[in-house]
Amino acid sequence: MAPPSEETPLISQRSCSLSSSEAGALHVLLPPRGPGPPQRLSFSFGDYLAEDLCVRAAKACGILPVYHSLFALATEDLSCWFPPSHIFSIEDVDTQVLVYRLRFYFPGWFGLETCHRFGLHKDLTSAILDVHVLEHLFAQHRSDLVSGRLPVGLSLKDQGEFLSLAVLDLAQMARKQAQRPGELLKSVSYKACLPPSLRDLIQGQSFVTRRRIRRTVVQALRRVVACQADRYALMAKYILDLERLHPAATTESFLVGLPGAQEEPGCLRVTGDNGIAWSSKDQELFQTFCDFPEIVDVSIKQAPRVGPAGEHRLVTITRMDGHILEAEFPGLPEALSFVALVDGYFRLICDSRHFFCKEVAPPRLLEEEAELCHGPITLDFAIHKLKAAGSLPGSYILRRSPQDYDSFLLTACVQTPLGPDYKGCLIRQDPSGAFSLVGLSQLHRSLQELLTACWHSGLQVDGTALNLTSCCVPRPKEKSNLIVVRRGRNPTPAPGHSPSCCALTKLSFHTIPADSLEWHENLGHGSFTKIFHGHRREVVDGETHDTEVLLKVMDSRHQNCMESFLEAASLMSQVSYPHLVLLHGVCMAGDSIMVQEFVYLGAIDTYLRKRGHLVPASWKLQVTKQLAYALNYLEDKGLPHGNVSARKVLLAREGVDGNPPFIKLSDPGVSPTVLSLEMLTDRIPWVAPECLQEAGTLNLEADKWGFGATTWEVFSGAPMHITSLEPAKKLKFYEDRGQLPALKWTELEGLIAQCMAYDPGRRPSFRAILRDLNGLITSDYELLSDPTPGIPNPRDELCGGAQLYACQDPAIFEERHLKYISLLGKGNFGSVELCRYDPLGDNTGPLVAVKQLQHSGPEQQRDFQREIQILKALHCDFIVKYRGVSYGPGRQSLRLVMEYLPSGCLRDFLQRHRARLHNDRLLLFAWQICKGMEYLGARRCVHRDLAARNILVESEAHVKIADFGLAKLLPLGKDYYVVREPGQSPIFWYAPESLSDNIFSRQSDVWSFGVVLYELFTYSDKSCSPSTEFLRMMGPEREGSPLCHLLELLAEGRRLPPPSTCPTEVQELMQLCWSPNPQDRPAFDTLSPQLDALWRGSPG
């Protein structure tokens, strides 16, 4: 065969050529590893699962099981991808051609400082991909480029970039074939490594020009080959450079119909590092809807209209805060392609055990669920989990082999004279699907059948007897080597962390004065409280706000439960969710009084008793689903409720006139951890059995049990017989592992049984519960039905009529529907209030933070509008989220609506929780603030007011930059901004050039960041705040302006003193941030990896 000519591409234009004799076959194409047509796998008549075909292709390419989830099958033109559950049916006349490709991308994924797989410790992380995946990805990218699949530009800059890629391509060939550049170029042309359009352009040049270009390429090739980089480093460089030139190569876009866009199509874009974004047809700019961890559930329903390709499908994505995105796809294949993409990213980033829809569930994952088997986790994670479970002799883990698709591994704990040890057995699966232990010939139909046989017959491994006793089953959200940690994202805590029931609740709540409360009628009694109807009056700026409230008074006879009662109040004051009751605060005058919002229709157990059979199953299902949303929110926060029952579920809206019902979960009250056995027995069957067996403990799994019992309670329509039993019989019910009577809705039986499993480890996550509830009702038919419904079947929504679609832009909040709740903060220029946006007038709308100006002259209005435009354009995990705006009559006034973060500002948070915030958490906060500032700098935004008071706390592991009232956008072509009228300024946070010349830049923000580091490591202690320290340096007898004295101090080299507990490395970063010359200060993109490295190296 003659060597390729100058015009011969390494990849042929057609992927393959199929003759008529190949009819009735399925071909899976693999990316070519060199010149010639791609390798392909062919399959004859029959049915084939997409995931099974992927496994066959992975074996052919040397892709290990750990990396299997990065790949998928697509049509040859990449117009449609197939979910793992898709079945290909090959008949006599059919010929189908598919491509096996890497679908899930993480840009910048080389190097552990960018993206990596989760490790047990910060120094035990691993790369996302190995050399076989690297080779596959390189071949895939190179094939796309030289075949013309990627659109390319032909500017001089672009030509230089693609010639550089050709040099890298040729260099890796030289490494692979152990050839010198001259020898290689005798058989391969550099033009064969270029996109077709550039190849044609060069071919059309004069001989002299072609000769000059070739000489340049040869010289560059010799320099690259002479360096020490190996072939894999060259391939990695090629991939990163190509993804930099063509970011679209790592994204997928879908044309869809969006609500409010009429007939105009919109576009959804999915990327591994940013999640889901959307854009309408007339907008080029994409707006972020959510990142993958924010997704609660995804559903596919039949859309009302029919298109040319068949029935349209409506995909609904629900975000953690209750907002939804609805997109209409032209057909089921397109909808499944999109959902499978989101589903796959969620498993890679958040939870390797979860799937959103059964239509796209990987069959191997379903098999693992049925067999109580883990995925291909490494031995380190298996042993770690056994240790976390107590290293009990006989405990074991079943997992897929990380090396072989047809093998499973049994890792068990045994007791030896030297202590616990861990032994392993290899289990093989033959082509028929039967299982056998290596060394034993007996076959078994399932893994569980094999393990049962082992329990009866016993096992010997290395001369040690294995007596299997208890299985450590997979749990939702477990961290392992299957999880990818992305760059610039919140680092995840180590696996095995047991959430504390008081993770956020160190008695932090708003105190309400007794004289602001007005008492009305008594509404009854709780287990430990007396309950009253009342009003709260608050005067702000001369205006009186009157709010209807519920008053819960702690009974003086239960003083021993007072701390638990206040912990419940503290928990509710630090969470914000539509389906959780709002706590206004606590009044400590005499008795402890919890002041909550008043929910008019009361508890749903009472409501259901009143309405009886008139309440349809569809109504009950929506109420149950809303309760699951609330508990999922708490689960994601790591906060167990501990007292889930129908009497704790309050009905805010009945659900008539086409609006769905709306519920709110009330506070947990006194925790089961402090209750006596007699009181716990009285709570059967809502209290989880383990709460009785292990007094003083409360885990998230207990809420799953309570949810199951509450679901039974809502649907049964009859009293629970068990509640009338004697205490001894109640306990016997649990001892005998009794079950509640069967409901007439058999569809719910399986879900309730899973939630009320006596083994807490086998209860599903609330995301999985929501998925199963979604499966009970579709738009095609109703599975749950009542013969005599009394209430109209409303549309299935999370937050009802107050729901805001993500694609409304700008979001306009009607002023009349913003209900004042309390004052969050007040400054020289404006105030921020907590409001509920409640267009239906029934207290079911979301909580929001609303900023308004104190003085609204024309200049202040312009500055405020600028602040709004800046915040509106920002989409970052570490910057407070813009929600919308609200206009007064005639648009004479303007208010900014933002997300509400109940934990308040970082300054106050540090002061409150100093005792439990160690250096590792402070470094995490510092890194997050730095990443937020890096994001701002990349968008030419200078904050000008960076301080701990202007950073909000979302959770104990997440902070966000807020207050953009002084922010400025740098003019194009300039790196600084001169403020003409500085007004009142936070001078003790300002850089010298800002104080003397009103010059602000990214470098001046770096100076302020150094002060924030100081605030972090002094815990914002007032006695050593920046202002206190500088004023102390100035001395008591100072005269004149503090600004002049401060400038003199800084010019003399005086700086804030190093905090006593601050690591030396952080002190050095502070001093660099406070360099007098702005050019000597490190940039945020330099500080970020340094802080990340310090966080990873810190204990804890």
From Swiss-Prot:
Cystine bridges: none
- List the subcellular locations: Endomembrane system; Cytoplasm
Domain (Protein kinase) spans 517-777, 818-1091
Q: Which domain of life is it from?
A: Eukaryota
- Residues that coordinate or bind ATP: 824-832, 851
This one is known as Tyrosine-protein kinase JAK3
Topological type in the membrane: Peripheral membrane protein
Annotated FERM domain ranges read 24-353
Task: Give the main EC class.
Answer: transferase
Q: How does it assemble?
A: Interacts with STAM2 and MYO18A. Interacts with SHB. Interacts with CD69.
What does the domain comment read? Possesses two phosphotransferase domains. The second one contains the catalytic domain, while the presence of a pseudokinase domain is required for suppression of basal activity of JAK3.
Q: Which family does it belong to?
A: Belongs to the protein kinase superfamily. Tyr protein kinase family. JAK subfamily.
| SMART domains from the UniProt entry | B41, SH2, TyrKc
Post-translational modification, as annotated: Autophosphorylated, leading to regulate its activity. IL2 promotes phosphorylation on tyrosine residues, including autophosphorylation on Tyr-781. Dephosphorylation of Tyr-976 and Tyr-977 by PTPN2 negatively regulates cytokine-mediated signaling.
Cellular component GO terms, alphabetical: cytoskeleton; cytosol; endomembrane system; extrinsic component of cytoplasmic side of plasma membrane
Catalytic site positions: 945 (proton acceptor)
Gene Ontology MF, one: non-membrane spanning protein tyrosine kinase activity
Q: Where is this region: cytokine/interferon/growth hormone receptors?
A: 1-223
Q: Which residues form the SH2 domain?
A: 372-472
Query: For this chain's UniProt record, which GO biological process terms are given?
Result: adaptive immune response; B cell differentiation; cell differentiation; cell surface receptor signaling pathway via JAK-STAT; cellular response to cytokine stimulus; cytokine-mediated signaling pathway; enzyme-linked receptor protein signaling pathway; growth hormone receptor signaling pathway via JAK-STAT
Q: What does this protein do?
A: Non-receptor tyrosine kinase involved in various processes such as cell growth, development, or differentiation. Mediates essential signaling events in both innate and adaptive immunity and plays a crucial role in hematopoiesis during T-cells development. In the cytoplasm, plays a pivotal role in signal transduction via its association with type I receptors sharing the common subunit gamma such as IL2R, IL4R, IL7R, IL9R, IL15R and IL21R.
For the modification Phosphoserine, the affected residues are: 17
Gene3D superfamilies for this protein: Phosphorylase Kinase, domain 1, Pleckstrin-homology domain (PH domain)/Phosphotyrosine-binding domain (PTB), SH2 domain, Transferase(Phosphotransferase) domain 1
Give residues where Phosphotyrosine occurs: 781, 900, 935, 976-977
- Reactions performed catalytically: L-tyrosyl-[protein] + ATP = O-phospho-L-tyrosyl-[protein] + ADP + H(+)
This entry's Enzyme Commission designation comes to: 2.7.10.2
